[in-house]
Amino acid sequence: MIVFPAIDLKGGEVVRLAEGDMDRATVYGDNPAAQAMLFAEAGAEHLHVVDLDGAFAGESRNREAVEAIVAEFPGYVQLGGGIRDATAVEGWFNLGVARIVIGSAALKDPDFVKEMAREWENGIVVAVDARDGMIATEGWAEVSDVPVADMARRFEDAGVASLLFTDIGRDGLLKGCNIDATVELARQTDMPVIASGGVKGLDDIHVLSLHAHEGIEGVITGRALYEGRLDLAAAIAMGARS
């Protein structure tokens, strides 16, 4: 199981939000590329980056920071946030991003996502971000009437690399990952699932790793790392054993 340390970008700074609320941002640094290298030094080979400004605006607002991260980080960068057209997808892949996460466009234009998945083999991840079990879009500001499982089924056999499941109500709060909902989603689909939202420590990593055989491909963690509650090297080692 892959452990993805997270770098969320707002105004060029490294931040974490509480429940996706841009007004509840905690700043953890002003040098995203340097933070990426700290994660690399701890053994990270995979990195999850989110352009928060882009998620709300629908276009990249932290391009310079993302470019610096991709240039410096020696591993695999997964990027999401406001990527909603083919030009943006192609641009990021050409820059060196390994995987693109698409959320809002996946709900509103699933054919676009399927087209991108065909064009960029193993390169597209669909974000299934949920508030109380319903898909949320536009930087989590809008909640739909589409259940998580229904959203996932739209992309069965479409060539999507993975599903990224986030329980918004836990994100950035250190309440613990919603393991039951994550595992249930993995059981309902043939696509690998990446867990996100609320990771508070090594126990979450351990329990998720026990379900790797059921399709849990990875887990994203941010605040627990920045606040010293989770040792990244230990988490990576635990994930590697699953």
From Swiss-Prot:
What GO cellular component term, any one, is given?
A: cytoplasm
Q: Which residues form a coiled coil?
A: none
Keyword DNA damage set for record = no
Q: Which UniProt keywords apply?
A: Amino-acid biosynthesis, Cytoplasm, Histidine biosynthesis, Isomerase
Amino-acid biosynthesis recorded as keyword: yes
**Reactions the enzyme catalyzes:** 1-(5-phospho-beta-D-ribosyl)-5-[(5-phospho-beta-D-ribosylamino)methylideneamino]imidazole-4-carboxamide = 5-[(5-phospho-1-deoxy-D-ribulos-1-ylimino)methylamino]-1-(5-phospho-beta-D-ribosyl)imidazole-4-carboxamide
Question: Which EC number(s) does the record attach to this protein?
Answer: 5.3.1.16
UniProt cross-references to InterPro entries, sorted A to Z? Aldolase_TIM, His_biosynth, HisA_bact_arch, Isoase_HisA-like, Isoase_HisA-like_bact, RibuloseP-bd_barrel
The protein here is known as: 1-(5-phosphoribosyl)-5-[(5-phosphoribosylamino)methylideneamino] imidazole-4-carboxamide isomerase
